Regions:
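A residue-level marker of the well-folded mature domains of exported/periplasmic proteins
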Residues: 1-244
């Protein structure tokens, strides 16, 4: 999957939800929670979101009250929920205890979003609904989306990833040229792009990649995005569970 795009989808969701392009003199407060610094994917997620939001930060439309905007400051070792919870509790106590309004908690994934949500529920002095992003479509987070506690998650259909991997392996065994032509030959019914620039090996060599496009999931499209394709089932009460 295109992990940079995961971040841009999160960032663009914030832009669209707050209508930042038409904010005028209105300003919003945002805090970032990124992933494990030992996981190279975490940097792609964070950079994708930050690149979208940086123009609004530079313009003063978005304010990072804590001042924590670099990856190392906002990273969460092991993507740990408790670590994310405690860090957000510290931020809330240090910068928002006086009633300053927090509008957005940009979380790179669902495990960190879960901790951030818990911290906001227990320690946030404001009474507004905080926009919270995530990624993965974890069951607990989907329940929070149903309950209005989390705004969105970015879902990556691993079944589609498996299809691409299988077709790629077949093409390699057949001695076919591996390039963008594989996409047309395979006739996949999902969006995929061939990329030769974005990703590198550990020694700095470019790594050609087939990048699938993830899906933004909100309360409004849970059925269409997750249930109808068979990834999840939905109970009568609206809560989702992974399909067997």
């Amino acid at each position: 999957f295109d992990n940079y795009t995961v971040g841009t989808l999160q960032g663009q969701y914030v832009v669209d939800s707050l209508d930042l392009d038409n904010a005028g003199d209105k300003t919003y407060n945002i805090e970032f929670t990124a992933g494990d610094p030992a996981d190279n994917n975490a940097g792609y997620f964070f950079n994708g979101a930050f690149d979208v939001l940086k123009p609004y930060i530079d313009a003063g439309t978005l304010n990072v009250v804590s001042g924590q905007t670099d990856f190392d400051s906002v990273a969460t070792p092991a993507w740990d929920t408790q670590t994310a919870l405690e860090r957000m509790q510290n931020i809330l106590a240090s910068y928002y205890a006086d009633g300053t309004q927090l509008d957005v908690a940009l979380c790179s994934n669902d495990s960190t979003a879960l901790g951030v949500t818990q911290a906001i529920e227990s320690d946030y002095a404001g009474d507004n609904t905080v926009l919270i992003t995530g990624q993965d479509g974890d069951e607990a987070n989907l329940a929070n989306i149903v309950d209005g506690k989390q705004s969105m998650t970015v879902y990556k259909a691993v079944a589609n990833e498996a299809v691409v991997t299988l077709d790629l392996a077949k093409a390699m065994l057949a001695g076919d040229t591996i390039d963008e032509s594989l996409i047309e030959k395979s006739g996949w019914d999902f969006e995929c792009a061939y990329d030769t620039e974005s990703y590198e090996t550990s020694d700095g060599n470019k790594c050609p990649s087939f990048l699938l496009v993830p899906t933004v999931v909100t309360k409004d499209n849970l059925q269409e995005a997750l249930v109808d394709p068979g990834y999840y089932t939905m109970d009568d009460d609206g809560y989702l569970h992974p399909a067997n």
